[in-house]
Amino acid sequence: MQNSPWFVEFSDVWLAYNDELLKQNHFAVEAIDLKVRQGEFIAIVGPSGCGKSTFMKLTTGLKMPSKGRILIDQQPVTGPLKISGMAFQAPSLLPWRTTVDNVLLPLEIVEPYRSSFKAKRKEYEERARKLLQKVGLGGYEDKFPWQLSGGMQQRASICRALIHEPKMLLLDEPFGALDAFTREELWCILRDLWTEQQFNVILVTHDLRESVFLADTVYVMSKSPGRFVVKREIDIPRPRDLEVTYTQAFGDIVHELRGHIGAMRKTTLSAPAVAPA
């Protein structure tokens, strides 16, 4: 991975949510510089409201920066990306569609799949069923969301995000509402999918254990206006089993990250930097 090309590049990126805030130099995120290798798994942690979700919107092209440049897969971001998939804390499955039909939804609405969906329905459905089997939902493909547990719904949500075989998966607190045991099961499922397919992953989470277990690199964001203040490479060898979370090395990294975030909570926010003209 060290010799892989850069897949995500942020160069001095600033975002104000409207022109009035821009005139006041009031930014949601500021001075973001980031380079992520192709196939890398990164996690972003930080206090609530620090700009983590804003960063995700910039990465997917849902928001354009006020200043700076963003490249994804060596191409400028000029609008919503088709090469990315997203999953959130709420699975948001459509209640009138079966599990497999929920997973297929992106293929029905996103080109180039949309125009060929009817002709290739059987092929796409086979892909969806295989993906559901990989995440442990074999036998539940034709169930409705109300027949699935929260963990099962989140597995289906991840499958939906991956059905169009994106180059990048963005996860915004995907396991935050789940119990500890289910959460750890899904860590392992995500780990296995990433290991097999080697897409890029950007994970936003408040769970430091989750970030250290899954990521190659963890970034800590400051309080708003958000900027990256710590980059911590996770030097725990892969493949990682859950037993690694009980080791001294793992615990030390978690405590180190917690210390960075705790220090930010104790300090008074300094005045935001002024963006370059």
Descriptions of predicted regions:
Residues 45-47:
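The feature captures the beta-strand-to-loop junction immediately N-terminal to the Walker
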Residues 60:
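Helix-to-loop junction immediately C-terminal to a conserved catalytic motif
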Residues 68-79:
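Conserved ABC transporter NBD signature motif
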Residues 104, 108-111, 116-140, 192:
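Conserved ABC ATPase "signature" region
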Residues 144-148, 152:
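Conserved ABC ATPase signature
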Residues 163-167:
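A short, proline-enriched helix->beta-strand linker immediately N-terminal to the Walker B motif
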Residues 169-172:
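Catalytic Walker B motif of ABC-type/P-loop ATPase nucleotide-binding domains
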